[in-house]
A protein has these predicted regions:
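Active-site-proximal specificity loops/subdomain of glycosyltransferases
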Residues: 21, 25, 54-82
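Conserved alpha/beta core of the MobA/IspD/sugar-nucleotide pyrophosphorylase nucleotidyltransferase superfamily
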Residues: 155-228
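Short, glycine-/small-residue-rich phosphate/pyrophosphate-handling segment
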Residues: 132-155
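A short, conserved beta-to-alpha structural element at the edge of catalytic cores
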Residues: 112-133, 198-203
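N-terminal nucleotide-binding beta1-loop-alpha1 segment
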Residues: 1-23
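A short, N-terminal amphipathic alpha-helix
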Residues: 36-53
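Conserved donor-nucleotide/metal-binding helix-loop-beta segment in metal-dependent transferases, i.e.
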Residues: 96-122
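Short beta-strand-to-loop acidic/aromatic patch adjacent to the donor-nucleotide binding site
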Residues: 84-92
Length: 228
């Protein structure tokens, strides 16, 4: 039996748009938040590129439809129409994403299974599936962008497997401490965040919130935390 063609759909807004929708450090202005999202997107790209799979980045200028669900369905179907019959979907939200997560998703989809990487907020950070497991009518009814999504999407997909335990989800209330603690994996981003916060301290002569935490104060001297 011939193996189906597999592609990655990177469904993510441009950094300039994302910085307006979900600023992670709103008090530091638009440009800082744009740069944060550029680094996050660069990191996701570095994870996708070694797979050798075709990657289709559908940003906000290319998305068509009313509402998140319809836009995502249209994007997925546009890739199926190119002749691909297996698809992995991810976006910017999984800042804890590692190569092992994507590799496991590839393995599951190639084995004929659908798969999900859950978020701690009840969402889905990565979706893997065959074209035959996709149902537009069902997907349009799913509670996208809510804490109910994962459970309903899991029930919607046949032969669905979990890629890993739930990971933190990037949102406007993200704890910057978490990004700093992950500095072993987000070295450039962590260094930039530290520089921004330290500049604020120097200009305002007041400690940024993270300095109140002794753990955060010592982050630059620590190695990366162990994560299974």
């Amino acid at each position: 039996m011939k193996e189906g063609r597999l592609a990655i759909l990177y469904f993510a807004y441009r950094p300039e748009k994302e910085a307006i929708r979900k600023p992670l450090l709103p008090e530091f202005g638009h440009d800082v938040n744009v740069h944060i999202y550029k680094m996050l997107q660069s990191r996701v790209s570095d994870i996708m590129q070694p797979t050798g799979l075709p990657v289709f980045h559908v940003d906000d200028t290319m998305q068509k439809g009313n509402g998140f669900g319809e836009r995502l369905c249209n994007a997925a179907e546009s890739i199926f129409k190119k002749g691909f019959d297996r698809l992995i979907i991810l976006g910017n939200d999984a800042y804890g994403l590692k190569p092992k997560h994507l590799n496991k998703a590839i393995e599951q989809v190639r084995a004929g299974n659908s798969c999900l990487l859950p978020s701690e907020l009840g969402g889905a950070l990565m979706i893997g599936m065959e074209k035959s497991q996709y149902n537009r009518a069902h997907w349009l009814e799913l509670p996208w962008c809510t804490e109910k999504l994962f459970n309903e999407l899991f029930d919607c997909l046949s032969s669905c497997k979990l890629i890993d335990k739930a990971l933190p989800e990037l949102n406007s209330n993200v704890d910057i401490h978490e990004l700093l603690i992950m500095k072993g994996e987000l070295t450039e981003l962590a260094a930039y965040l530290l520089a921004v916060l330290e500049t604020s301290f120097n200009e305002n002569h007041a400690y940024p919130p993270f300095h109140e935490d002794p753990l955060a104060e010592n982050l630059r001297f620590r190695g990366p935390p162990f994560m299974a």
